[in-house]
Amino acid sequence: MRKRAVLAGALVVTSVVFGLPASGQASSATRWTLTAPGMSVHQGATPEAHIALDRGRLTLSVTRGATTVLEPSALGVETANGDLTSGLAVTGFSQRPIHETYETKVGRRLNHTVDAAETTLNLRGTGGQAFAVVFRVSADGVAYRYVFDTPKWTTVVREASEFAVPQTADSFLLPYDNGRSDYESIHVHRPVAQQDPVEYGYPSLFHVGDSWLTVLESDLNGSYGGSRLKLDAASKRFGLVLPDPAEVAKGPLRTPWRAMIVGDLATVAESTLVTDLASPSKLADTSWIKPGVGAWSWWSDGPSAGSLEKQKQFVDYAAKMGWEYTLVDSGWNASWIPELVKYAADRHVGIWLWADAKITDTDSEREKNFKQYRDWGVVGLKIDFVESDRQDRTRWYDDVLAASAKYHLMLNFHGAPIPRGIERTWPQVMSVEAVKGAEGTKPKPGREPFPIEHYVTLPFTRNLTGSMDFTPVTFSGVRPNSEGGELALAVVYESGVQHFADSVESYQARPVAERLLSHVPTVWDETRLLAGDPGKLAVFARRSGAKWYVGAITAGSATQLDTPLTFLPPGDWLAEIYGDGADGKLVQTTQRVTPGSALSVPVAANGGYSARFCQAPPGATSC
């Protein structure tokens, strides 16, 4: 007899249906439906998780309304002690509501509220090994993880975890193909059925009917390696691939969350599910952690990192612009760093230093170097050449993060894997590269610009999993977009420390750009997607305090963007608009607007615009 349990909000169980098969080999299937708190089954607007145990095999599918965004997909793991992918029997379950509030120092939102329903399904394999699968369902997604509640060592050699996205779904996938685990590739946009059977890095974005699905990973630490997906050539299902022959941990093991953001495009673009699932902050005192803008000389003048005088010039410019930091990249000299730090401090600018990951490999190296940097007065480190998702590297992260917190050093990882909720657990992480960014637009003979679609895909893919150090607003780079579109990246791309990478002279030649760049924040109290089509259009509204900003970027022909301003609170507002003039140069215009207005801005081919909104008392003409 088929048995079915309906867990509304994962808290209410119908009284007669939770009869469990006596054995995982029973011929009947037991099914459960999990919903977000306060949601009834088939309500439609939010995702539902459908779990089935059929002939000893566990599967998960996900629906949103009438749309199946994830077809029945295998769950389970294989350990050194046995195969936990088949022959499974349920030994019990438990449920609890999740209600949390937390703060982050960076991101699309700084204050967070989590409401989710959690169900733990306890299972036993044919060999007697026990484990659990923990599911969470919220209004914006579904996630699960495996738990081994044992004080002994656990060795996971394989996960059966798969994601059977409908083959007709549109997909935006990042090939994991360059051998460096640095996520510096360009997304491939095709239906699932036409994607190559290779490995892909997170996050993976899919358009399924009227719904969007993003697959990603959260809460990774040294007990596990960072996974990726591989598309099977025959089945066209995505299997989860581990980076090591085995992931080994002592004591209770909780694997990272296998997470799916599900909803309309605005739900996906605004979601903070990746930090909602991450472990709480390990730091009691975060007063020393301060996001901001950084001047950076390496992009425009590589050898300048070795010149004290050049670095002072960038400090002077940062001070003039009101930017908080200057980053000194590879080539700095220890003999003059204390002088530079004092020079910068006198101008209210902090100094970040570049560091090769190799000098942080051991406890003694970390203690020696981090203490030296802190004694100099350095505020943060850009650690480069991380280049691995393997478990030995995630253990390294644990050590580096703890040591940097001890010495009050903020961090930015380059040549590194994507963040997976790290900014909640370790708030001193201001950003991570993990993107084919502006370093690849640095002028040199024969260099071709990135496809314009790359720029307009990133807000819906890479930036969803955490702060992204693209190092934007490089007017003198090899690029496909207009100047208005390039300037708008300062608003469209989110990074806790935002490095505007062009030369001082390039910015000084564009006073319109300087006006925006001297004011634009790097962290946001609120973010809303106003319009979007990955690879074609992205229009975001972001709030910092009482001020709102809009950033819009497009791919394609010149057009006019009409943006309703319903996100503004009641009252009269001034809009300072930064876009492309008829001659291709940046222009600024000002309009008085209200929440009932629509902003109509002509946009050049592959263009964009940015706008700053402030409340306008009578007679005000600027913000």
Specify the residue positions occupied by each region the protein language model found.
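C-terminal beta-strand-rich structural cap/linker in extracellular carbohydrate-active enzymes
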Residues: 591-623
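Carbohydrate-binding surface patches
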Residues: 533-570, 609-610
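Aromatic- and carboxylate-enriched substrate-binding clefts and catalytic-loop regions
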Residues: 330-482
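Conserved, mostly hydrophobic/aromatic
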Residues: 146, 318, 384, 411, ...
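Secretory targeting and sorting signals
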Residues: 1-26
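Glycan-recognition and catalytic regions of carbohydrate-active enzymes
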Residues: 502-549, 583-584, 588
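An acidic-aromatic substrate-binding cleft motif
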Residues: 250-325
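N-terminal accessory beta-strand-rich subdomains and adjacent acidic, glycine-rich linkers
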Residues: 30-276, 585
